[in-house]
Amino acid sequence: MVSRNSDGYFLDPTGMTVPGLGPSFTAAVSSSSSPTTSSTAVAVADVTAMVSSSEEDLSKKIRKPYTITKSRESWTEPEHDKFLEALQLFDRDWKKIEAFIGSKTVIQIRSHAQKYFLKVQKSGTGEHLPPPRPKRKAAHPYPQKAHKNVQLQVPGSFKSTSEPNDPSFMFRPESSSMLMTSPTTAAAAPWTNNAQTISFTPLPKAGAGANNNCSSSSENTPRPRSNRDARDHGNVGHSLRVLPDFAQVYGFIGSVFDPYASNHLQKLKKMDPIDVETVLLLMRNLSINLSSPDFEDHRRLLSSYDIGSETATDHGGVNKTLNKDPPEIST
């Protein structure tokens, strides 16, 4: 059947009715097809979300895998002994501890120190632990060590170049449980009443729970020192000697004033560096004391006994000493 209407006619699928069927049947058909359409829309949304999430994963920076650049090195017994010795001398100055040990880096030393500190705190053996560094704006800043080239001034006419923080003026923990004084103070004459002196004072034994103390001229507060384990007594050979051989030191100083002794320079070359430094320190202090005005009365008293004229030929060193001339060291 051909329609006579010249205008086009667009069929509405929702409102179109089938001949012989009412509009209610058409509505039922449209309602039955709506669940299929909604499920399709949900599936499309899920696919879109998956695609967007995959794009985000690709856009994220890939994390670089962790690689160990250097394998862990175990600490040997000599290295650990040097580490303990450096803790006594430098506290938490890791750069100086690194230079003292020589075979470990600062990172390795700090890691080893952290483990050692935790072990000591748990065991409760009373080992020496250096105090932690305070914050920058702390009321009591961390005490700084005196530089090696800094000379300490003693009140009065005497000058002292001793350095309390130098390793040569400190006892090893197993060598003695006493306080020691520097060779400069030990060589000071009794007429130096205005100079500060440090006397030898015995301390309680380590078994009573007390720790050894180390005295410092810059601070009056004693710092706790601890005793080593028994194993350190067998490892003295590989550890550095920090105590001068005073018998050899004073023997050399006595030979300087002996007119029959010679080859002093050769003897100095054969001595350990710590003994050489102690000899030079004592000789410098002796020359300062002899040239001070306080010694003038003693020099006149000795001159009254005419020691200079009696020993002018046999004991030239004594005569030169009384006349403020430094003794000559023969080579």
Swiss-Prot record:
Origin superkingdom: Eukaryota
Protein name as catalogued: Protein REVEILLE 6
Residue ranges of DNA binding: 94-117
Chain ranges of the HTH myb-type domain: 67-121
Low complexity compositional bias, start-end: 211-220
GO cellular component terms, A-Z: nucleus
Disruption phenotype: Monochromatic blue and red lights have opposite effects on the period of triple mutants rve468 lacking RVE4, RVE6 and RVE8; lack of blue light-specific increase in expression of some circadian clock genes. In long day conditions, rve468 plants have a larger size and a delayed flowering. In short days, rve468 plants exhibit long petioles.
Gene Ontology biological process terms, A to Z: circadian regulation of gene expression; circadian rhythm; entrainment of circadian clock by photoperiod; regulation of circadian rhythm; regulation of leaf development; regulation of photomorphogenesis; regulation of photoperiodism, flowering; response to blue light
Stored PROSITE patterns: HTH_MYB
Gene3D superfamilies given in the database record: Homeodomain-like
Basic and acidic residues: compositionally biased ranges: 226-235, 322-331
GO molecular function: DNA binding; DNA-binding transcription factor activity
Residue spans of biased composition, Polar residues class: 150-165
Ranges where the record places region Disordered: 122-166, 203-237, 309-331
This protein's record includes keyword DNA-binding: yes
Purpose of the protein: Probable transcription factor. RVE4, RVE6 and RVE8 are components of the circadian system acting synergistically to regulate flowering time, redundantly to regulate leaf growth, and antagonistically to regulate hypocotyl elongation; their action seems independent of ZTL and HY5.
Subcellular location: Nucleus
Pfam families attached to this UniProt entry: Myb_DNA-binding, RVE6
Keywords, in A-Z order: DNA-binding, Nucleus, Transcription, Transcription regulation
InterPro entries reported for this sequence: Homeodomain-like_sf, Myb_dom, Myb_dom_plants, SANT/Myb, SANT_dom
